[in-house]
Amino acid sequence: MEGWDKGTKSVVGEIPLLSTRAGPRDGEAWRQRLKEEYRALIAYTSVNKSKDNDWFRISAANPEGTRWEGTCWYVHNLRRYEFPLQFDIPVAYPQVAPEIELPTLDGKTHKMYRGGKICLTVHFKPLWAKNCPRFGIAHALCLGLAPWLAAEVPILVDSGMVKHKDDEAAPADAAAAASGSAAAS
């Protein structure tokens, strides 16, 4: 993991590696893999909370564990920007990494594919391939989504492509106040 900062290496070292090579079509082996995925996610979340770096919530959206949904956030200029997060587990998983989607950012950056899938091809996918099947969902979040958010959110905010929820509500509140004062006249 050359090129990663010490903090990232430290966190990745605390996420348990997975051992079961199984995908959604592998029956009982997939259920075992899901147990390992949950253990790794719980460990990663615990590490983040202990370091005051809590930045996502995620859970399986179906009983099979093939669809995942949640929320991730990034703090920029002391303001928290939240984004819905989703992805499907590919049929060829774990050989193929999940394609993480942030649908509300679709079309706002060049480092994203259609549908809001974040671009992970250059930096993350070779690392995933090298560490298959030991990497799982927690590793995809840590080494894929987290650096992507750190690189892209400040640019999107500074360019005006992403607005803080308080800034979006302010014009609507001002318009309501203006129409209220006009009605009172």
Curated annotation (Swiss-Prot):
Active site, UniProt feature: 119
InterPro entries in alphabetical order: UBQ-conjugating_enzyme/RWD, Ufc1
A biological process from GO: reticulophagy
Keyword presence, Membrane: no
GO MF annotations in UniProt: UFM1 conjugating enzyme activity; UFM1 transferase activity
Keywords of the record: Ubl conjugation pathway
Pfam family, one: UFC1
Domain of life of the source: Eukaryota
Stated role: E2-like enzyme which forms an intermediate with UFM1 via a thioester linkage.
Family, as annotated: Belongs to the ubiquitin-conjugating enzyme family. UFC1 subfamily.
Annotated protein name in UniProt: Ubiquitin-fold modifier-conjugating enzyme 1
Native source organism of the sequence: Oryza sativa subsp. japonica
